[in-house]
Design a protein with these regions (language model features):
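N-terminal targeting signals for export/organelle localization
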Residues: 1-66, 195
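A short beta-strand-turn-helix
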Residues: 57-85, 108
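Short pre-active-site segment immediately N-terminal to redox-active cysteine/selenocysteine motifs
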Residues: 83-85, 89-93, 160
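Hydrophobic beta-strand core positions in alpha/beta domains
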Residues: 88, 120-122, 165-166
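Thiol/disulfide oxidoreductase modules built on the thioredoxin-like
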Residues: 133-141, 146-193
Length: 195
């Protein structure tokens, strides 16, 4: 049996060269620079939609579709021309999306009589959550379409969720917001879309 005395059990550090320290510091700086640049790249990409014609899509209504054709009907952006539109790209598994859903529902209820249509665009794949169950569980009343193929998300340059896209009556993108957006900001953007 082997025994170890206290002097032998101490931790010995390998000597570090200044090169190693500088390399580690360099990696940290590159990482921090990346954190600063990546959001700007995404914002630029999405911001490039602002002022342009809204990308077209044709997606199936999966929940709360009575007001615009009934569940199972196809919804296109062309059908909605003449009305301001708030598109909410989200997924059932996304905690920030769950937090924003009641805000979007409140906006839908407040603005529906002013010519605004709110549409939730579920980005779940077929093996993820059920948007109908999500709508029921969260008391959502606005129409929800499903983007199973991801084509709509790609055409709108959706890189993260939740993302809101505000569209004017003339079919131009007014704003794109990623992350939880408060109701005052959404209402300000919708007013812009109606003006």
């Amino acid at each position: 049996m082997m025994t170890m005395d206290a002097a032998d059990s101490r931790v010995v550090r390998a000597p570090q060269s200044p090169r190693t320290t500088l390399a580690a510091l360099g990696l940290v700086l590159v990482f921090l620079a990346g954190l600063a640049v990546v959001p700007r790249v995404f914002a630029f990409h999405q911001g490039s939609l602002v002022g342009r014609d809204v990308p077209e899509f044709s997606l199936s209504l999966v929940a709360n579709g009575a007001a615009i054709g009934g569940d199972g009907a196809r919804v296109t952006m062309g059908q909605l021309r003449g009305r301001a539109v708030l598109l909410d790209f989200w997924a059932t598994w996304c905690p920030p999306c769950r937090a924003e859903a009641p805000i979007v529902d409140k906006i839908s209820r407040r603005w529906s009589d002013r010519g605004v249509v709110v549409i939730g665009v579920d980005t779940d794949t077929a093996d993820q959550g059920d948007p109908r169950e999500f709508a029921i569980a969260h008391g959502l009343t606005y129409p929800i379409v499903q983007d199973l193929s991801g084509a709509a998300s790609r055409s709108y340059a959706i890189e993260s969720i939740p993302t809101l896209v505000v569209v004017s009556r003339t079919g131009k993108v007014v704003a794109v917001r990623t992350g939880i957006t408060d109701d005052a900001e959404i209402e300000r953007l919708l007013q812009q879309a109606l003006d």
